[in-house]
């Protein structure tokens, strides 16, 4: 699924570790806004989180963990 910049999305962050922060199993429905598609393998998106998690406000999330809000 292709998401556009400024699109509101829901994220399943359970089990992901980003910049030393591990998201617990309960973080399956975080809200965010797509900033841009990121080049990576697997493909993903740079997302601005609605709420900061342990100081993280922007994170890269694999495409399979993103869905429309």
Map each language-model feature to its residues.
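Basic/aromatic-rich interaction segments and small domains that mediate binding to polyanionic partners
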Residues: 2-69
């Amino acid at each position: 699924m292709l998401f556009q910049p400024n699109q509101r999305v829901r994220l399943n962050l359970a089990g992901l570790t980003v910049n030393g922060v591990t998201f617990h199993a309960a973080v399956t429905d975080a809200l965010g806004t797509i900033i841009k598609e990121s080049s990576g393998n697997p493909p993903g998106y740079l997302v601005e989180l609605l709420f900061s998690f342990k100081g993280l406000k922007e994170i890269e999330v694999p495409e399979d963990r993103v869905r429309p809000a």
